[in-house]
Each structure stands twice: as C-alpha cells, then as structure tokens.
From Swiss-Prot:
Biological source species: Saccharomyces cerevisiae (strain ATCC 204508 / S288c) (Baker's yeast)
Domain of life, source organism: Eukaryota
UniProt entry tagged with the keyword NADP: no
Keyword hit for Phosphoprotein: no
Biased composition (Acidic residues): 71-80
Region feature (Disordered): 58-80
Location of the protein in the cell: Cytoplasm; Nucleus
Functional description taken from the UniProt entry: Involved in the regulation of anaerobiotic glycerol metabolism.
Gene behind the chain: YIG1
Protein name, as recorded: Protein YIG1
GO annotations of cellular component type: cytosol; nucleus
Entry keywords, A to Z: Cytoplasm, Nucleus
Annotated GO biological process: glycerol biosynthetic process
Amino acid sequence: MGIPMQIYQDGKGVQFYHTRYQNVFDERASKYGNYTVNNDYPQLPDTIKEHIDQLTFSNVGEDGGDVGNYSEEDDDGDEEKELEDVFRSNRGLEFVRINNYFTTHDLQSFKSFRNFNSKYWIFYSNQAEDKKLLLYDFNGQHLIFIKQQFYGQLNLLLSDAIICMDCNFGYNSNTIQILVGFQNGKLLKLNCDLNGNVNNHLLLKDPSTSSHQSHLSILNVWAGLLPHFVVSFSLKDGLLITSLDHQQSNGSFQSFHTNIDLPVDLRTTTNVKSVLNFPQFTLYKGNDMIFHCKNLLGSDASTLNKEINFMLKIDEDVQKIDYLLKTNHILLETNMRYLSIPTRDPIENSNSSPPVSDSEVYPIFYKTQELHVHASGTGRQIANNGKYIFITEQHLYGTALSVYKYSISFKRWLFVGYSDIRAKYGIRSVKDLFVGNCPSVNSPVLTILTDDNNIQTILLK
C-alpha cells in the first residue's frame, strides 16, 4: 500500500516502492526507491563544502565538544560517575537553586525553541494582532525583547504562522541574527543588537504562491553556519544550503542542494517529524521507520545512510523526535512513552550489517495513564543534554522531576532519581524545560519556565 519494505538478499538491501513512482528518470530512484526533490537548485560546489567544513570544525571547538557525539572512550572515566548516580538514586536527588528570574511577559501562550548551541531560548507568540519575539540568554540569565523601530513592523514581518526558529551571532558578538521559517515557505533573517533592536532584515526565501499546503512549510532551520550560510529543510525543496555570500542580480541569495535523497512518498506523508543538527539530519515519516544521515556533506549522502525500523503499540503515535548527541541515539517521544533508538557510524552501517531491530530500541519512561491521554505539552516536559534526560510530571500533590542517564556499560538508560520540585521550590506546573551544563562544576543545569512566569535555574549536585 505504498509502505516501503526492506529485504536482504546476499547481504544487499532491496527496497520496494509505490508503482506510480517507478517511471521517475533517476538512476538512484530506480535503485533505492528515492528521488531528489531539489533538482532545480545547483549542486553544492566543493569550495563551499570546504568552507562549511572549516566553519563546522571551528564551531565544535568553540562549543567545547557539546556538538560532538559521545564515544565509549569518553565513558572510560565514567565508572565512578555511574556509581555516584546509583548512590544518588538510593538517597534522592539534590538540587541547588542558583537563579530565579521573573518576567513581566506572559509566556504561557508562547511557543519556544532552543537555539543550535543552547545559548538562547527563543520564545514567540503567533497571535495575529500582537506578534512577539523574545530571547532568553542562558549565560546572562535575562530576557531580550525583540522590537522594531516602527510600531507594527514586526507584526508585518511575522504575519504568517511560524514553524521553526534558530539564532546565532553575526560577524561579531554585538549582533544577533534570528532565522524564522514559516508555514507558507517563507524564510526570514532578522538582524538585531544585544538590546533586541532590529536594524535590518533579509527575506531569504519568498514563495511564489500564497498557498499554505503542508509541503511548502519550512520545517527546520540551522543557524550554526551564520553569518555565511543558512541550512533549511522543507518537503518541497528538501535540504538546502543558502549562501549569504552569493547574492544574485535579482537580489535573491543562491541556494544549493545537498547530495541527500528523500523517501519517494514523502510529499504524501502527513505525520513528518524531522530534526536537524548539521551535518546530521533525521526524518520520521510514519510507517514505523526513521531515516538518519550522519553527514549531509559526506560522499555517501546520496541516500540516507541509515534506515531504522521499529514497532509502535496499538494507538501509539509519534509526537516528537530529538537527538541525544553524546550517545549516538535518537530520542523518540510518543503519546505513551519515551524511546531511545541507537544509530551507527557509516563504517558500521555496511551492507553486511543487519538493520536496527526492536531489541535495540530502549524504552526510557512510560507515561502515566492520567497524563498521556492529554494533549502534547500539558503536564509533562522533557529535556536532555546528551548524557542526562530530565522529565517533569505534574501530579495532584506534587511535581516530580525524574533523571535518567545512559550507561555504556549496561547499554540502557538508568534511573538516577527524582525530586519533588513543588515541595522544594514551589513549582506547581512546568511550562517548558531546558538543560545545559555548568563547566565549572561539570554538572547539569536546569532552566525551568513555571506557570507563574518565573524562569528558575537549578543545579544538580
């Protein structure tokens, strides 16, 4: 019925696909059942690839390795840490509150994103008559209200429904560049100072149609290569890299397509979930299958180099996917539970390697019956920093904060412990949750948006 199936003959994968796509004139489509959605854009030149490689290497160094993956070598010195976590689970968790910031803005109706390097929390309101955009600086622990010189100008720029956002510094640390992807396919870049004053903006992508079909939406943006490049993903154009150093005669900026091909039936899929952590890209398109590419610029990126099959329970739906960067795992949230699914390096993902099976899909946390029937985002929040996963649940008499850690030794997630943050800090309901790291003490730091507009920061001892 149009659902791709995978069989293995003589160690080689053969994929079957819907017959109405078999006449697509593309060698890769004939072989893999995939197609290239962005043939209208030129191929990414090698010189730009080299420039991007340099920028990516520089960003990893500046971020202290948080962008990288967690290896078994990194875990050699963690045996004592695992014993400490077992001790924590026996005696309970201890947190220390290090900041309590109260905002006059009502953030309860706002949606939020964490930017690519976890330096900013981006809040926005999609209300038609009053568009608002705010940044929370994790290091400075304060809010930046984004504003235009003329009243109503920001409402005009943000007039369409926002799907995704990201931000980064400009050519210097005194300017912030904010990327905004819209439902109608528009891609906007705002330049502002550290006080939130927008001094100029660029329309990087302007759809020629006003249609709001789902395949036009910009689903993901990546600001990690600013101020030189922007990475975006949509079902219409696939993964594009837009160069801000190459402006065309008509004023638009040149976009290039990557080598990656996408599943043949992607445009007809209604439950697409995707996450972009350049150069990684992961896509869930339903049918209990995840497509994962470790390096978009790699020579083997002409197909998503990992197909991960798994099974869901009856009436179980995928709500969100995310990365657990330091464990080479994907975090999958459904309406019933949280799952951790491993990905392999390309060298391990050879033709002779078996596909990921259900035995390698690790349940982390089963949602309680009274909460998992509610809408997504009510009563429960989750955040991770790669090593630790934090989950909050609001109950009748308390608000529990549970902590899990992945063990390389045991190949599973271990329960570290929990704390009642309502009894300790008066936090009744958690609207949003973020976890970072405090380098000075090598311990996770949680930033919690509460239902009374407090932004509380607590440290795990």
